[in-house]
């Protein structure tokens, strides 16, 4: 094996192995994402496209987007896009409370399961360079603005109250047991209008050899919100490893494996975790197809 192929194997296989092993640990969520794209070349350097995406996971999402990009030269490309997002608000919170001063306790959960729309605008610049005539290194900086109008959702509150009961038998011996009382209530939860601005920085390493239809790659992306306070706030970190395959000139299919560390929930305005932990991550298998003409 040549040095070039050895480096490529390390870059691509090591992250894949780590992602696969890490998915087996912790309370991780697993989803399947699918993408369908159509791209039309207006000129040699300018193209427009339409994208459809569906994410099957705990918080499912459907989106449709329109975009355009312009390649200034072989090192620099600019892009603009708009996406309509229709997302599921699936929030499940376990309630487990002990009543102070007694042996009684309450268990249950709060559940919100609704769908809501959002609008997203992107502006990006991508710089790339090719090393050793086969390794393409690119850095993409994307400004992302997401707007959501005020909406409301019904919250289901299920409770099971475990109450200690005490009695005496015919010999005046104390007998105790627990009785469970079940109740279900609903509450209308209001979500205000919000606009989130995020700077997304993605570094990507890709095998890009002329006349080779396969393009394996690895990438890492950082999402930093600029909507909270006077400094950037790290929302999430997303890593990916995958491969695309081009056939019949106009067709391209892709398969990738992504892992996302959520750090801050901007919609709920709450900290998910203070550090990048090896638990409670989102894993996704991404399947894609694009037709270019």
Please give the residue ranges for each predicted region.
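Predominantly the C-terminal beta-signal and adjacent terminal strand-loop region
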Residues: 218, 230, 234-293
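Repeated loop/turn-to-beta-strand initiation elements of outer-membrane beta-barrel proteins
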Residues: 44-50, 75-80, 133-137, 211-215, ...
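Hydrophobic, lipid-facing positions within transmembrane beta-strands of outer-membrane proteins
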Residues: 30-36, 46-48, 62-66, 119-123, ...
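Bacterial Sec-dependent N-terminal signal peptides
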Residues: 1-26, 293
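Outer-membrane beta-barrel translocator/channel fold
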Residues: 60-61, 77-176, 181-184, 194, ...
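Residues on the lipid-exposed face of transmembrane beta-strands in outer-membrane beta-barrel proteins
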Residues: 36-40, 66-70, 80, 123-127, ...
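Solvent-exposed loop/turn segments connecting transmembrane beta-strands
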Residues: 24-32, 52-63, 226-234, 277-281
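Outer-membrane beta-barrel biogenesis signature
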Residues: 19-44
């Amino acid at each position: 094996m040549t040095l070039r192929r050895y480096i490529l194997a390390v870059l691509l296989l090591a992250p894949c192995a780590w992602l696969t092993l890490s998915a087996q640990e912790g309370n991780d969520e697993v989803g399947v994402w699918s993408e369908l794209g159509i791209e039309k070349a207006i000129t040699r350097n300018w193209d427009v496209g339409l994208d459809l995406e569906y994410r099957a996971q705990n918080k499912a999402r459907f989106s449709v987007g329109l975009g355009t990009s312009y390649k200034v030269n072989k090192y620099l490309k600019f892009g603009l896009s708009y996406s309509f997002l229709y997302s599921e608000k699936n929030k499940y919170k376990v309630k487990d409370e002990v009543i102070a001063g007694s042996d009684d306790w309450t268990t249950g959960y709060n559940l919100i399961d609704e769908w809501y729309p959002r609008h997203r605008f992107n502006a990006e610049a991508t710089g790339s360079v090719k090393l050793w005539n086969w390794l393409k290194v690119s850095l993409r900086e994307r400004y992302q603005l997401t707007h959501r109008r005020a909406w409301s959702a019904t919250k289901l509150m299920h409770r099971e109250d475990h109450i200690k009961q005490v009695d005496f038998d015919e010999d005046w011996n104390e007998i105790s047991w627990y009785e469970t009382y079940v109740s279900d209530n609903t509450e209308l939860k209001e979500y205000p209008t919000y606009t989130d601005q995020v700077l997304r920085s993605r570094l990507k390493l890709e095998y890009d050899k002329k006349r080779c239809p396969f393009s394996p790659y690895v990438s890492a992306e950082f999402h930093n919100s600029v909507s909270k306070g006077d400094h950037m706030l790290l929302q999430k970190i997303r890593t990916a490893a995958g491969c695309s395959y081009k056939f019949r000139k106009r067709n391209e299919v892709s398969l990738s494996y992504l892992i996302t560390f959520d750090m801050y929930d901007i919609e709920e305005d709450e900290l998910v975790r203070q550090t990048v932990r090896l638990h409670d991550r989102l894993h996704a298998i991404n399947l894609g197809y694009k037709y270019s003409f």
